[in-house]
Amino acid sequence: MAQIYASTKPGVNPAEGWAAAIGSLSTGANLVLNNSELLKTISDKNGQLYDKKLKDFEKWFLPKAFAFGEGFEKAISPAAWEKFLKDLFEKADQGWKNFYKEQLEEGLLPALLDLTDFLDKVLEPFKTYNKDGKYHIYDPLTLDLDGDGIETVSHNGYKGALFDHDGDGIRTASGWVASDAGLLVVDRNGDGIINDGKALFGESSVLKDGTKAVHGYAALAEYDSNGDGVVDAKDADFDKLRVWRDLNQDGVSQKEELFTLEEVGVQSLNVAYQDTNQNLGNGNRLSQEGSYTGKDGNVRKMGDLLFGNNTLYSRYSQSVNLTDEQRAAANLQGIGRLRDLREAAALSPALAAALQAYTKAETKVQQKALLDDLVDKWAQTDPNYSVGTRFSAPMLRTANEGVALTPGQEKAMLMVGSVSDEYKEKLHELRTKIAALDAFSGEKSGVIYVQSKEQMESFLKTVRETYGKLTDNVYENLLFQTRLQPYLNKIGLKLENGEFKLDFTDVAALFGEVYARSPEKAFVDLGEFLAYSKISSGDNAFTELSSLMAQYSLDAVNSGTFEQYAEALGKEAMEKLGHKTGTEKDDTLYGNELANFITGGAGDDAISGYGGNDILHGGSGNDTLQ
């Protein structure tokens, strides 16, 4: 911990004290930013809220502290120096509050709240069903430039390449070629950038007749203007072709990554190919194989690849210009085919109204009542939004996939057209939830192919469960930007025994004011504040607030409202807080290191608070409390 040791002893240069104080402020800022789990992981279920913007606090505040230090020359006596330090500290505290408020208002913190890693796991069961949107995608022609074969890498979320393969303006996580291989490209619009899949040679290539190519070799064939089976300098547009080596593997072309064919040693490209189905590893496959001839006379591999992808991880190629008011709105990072929440709201009056109503809601009950509408309005900004999902029973067979049935399985198989009205109605009832899951995942679920009633039931159950987890995560990630934000705005800094610490005094006072008006609201707000903010359990502020929560719980028991309040707060939050209620039987209940409230109910109970400033309530029976 940083110590303030501004010396005022005779013979000591006061400037040393000033340097120490500023050094302490610097370290104190780092203390706040690095040691406070609250500000690093607020409302982020996976604890992955990036702290890059928060670290700007030190850069933001220290110049202001030095500017404030112009009054240092007046600190010529211990009393004056003490006053100066006090003023400086107050400046630090106010600076912190202003900085944090600015971050919230500008959306710098909320914009970093990321749903993707958590939802990637949540949505996986939904994505595994056989749908009409299931197809092999993204087949660019790729050149083996170093002679060791075409090497690829797996899609890797936001850490890997994001590329707009189909030209819809959305870059998605894609399998990719290694940096020692090259994608054959052509800058069709002349802007010096490989904007999307239309600039590659693959299924997104637009042919001269306006149709799309079936694969990369079909697109390449149009560049063989003299029809001799190779594309070389004798062909009209040979000099327009480029090879893109994505050296930094981000899926974004830079000027220094685009090479002429001559620069990478290519003499000619052979139009002939053979169909294949080679597994290249990393979720990528080789679908057509051909070759090219180098300037050195060597023949090397050129192949049409099928990249794996994850449409959940996405970025729109073009951002939306926001007004100051729109930038101040609550925000979540866009995923699938959805923009960031506040960008989507800027383009959709319906979503903007839903977000405003949700933000103004003052209780959990009110927000939960508005949550489905908010998620639905956000989902409707999906450019491919559709609620036309249906079940289909026919068996399917593709070039690479088939179905084999045992006699027992054949009996269980649905006959064509046998989807009952009952299941059609059940699916219809879930249509908006399915559309939302499609929008968030980037999937397409126009038709769900099933072979049995069990598969239909399984799909319907998966939709309900996955949608529930999605909305829960959206709710938790918006908590501290909406209903609980006023409490965050009260966080300050304090100087305790020469150390900078977060100060929750005003936070506790605000909870007290709310409690005086509505004990249930204060109970739920404080419970969620503690359950989802992830304040370090070793922080004194956490101990004080958890003790306050335990007192609210005891008050609720005494007033007969505890069960009502606990139900409003929710089982998950209660468990996170370590608050437990026994049954009518003989229970053994343990708390955790927090300030727990544990009530035994009926029966002869054994209750241990474990650690923290606990309130243990035995209830009826012959109880043991420790």
Please state what every model-predicted region is:
Residues 301-450, 457:
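Charged, amphipathic alpha-helical linkers/stalks
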Residues 125-329:
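Extracellular/luminal recognition modules and glycoprotein regions
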Residues 41, 127-129, 492-493:
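Assembly/interface hotspot detector across virion components, adhesins/toxins, and nucleic-acid enzymes
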Residues 26-29, 226-231, 618:
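Short, charged low-complexity linear motifs
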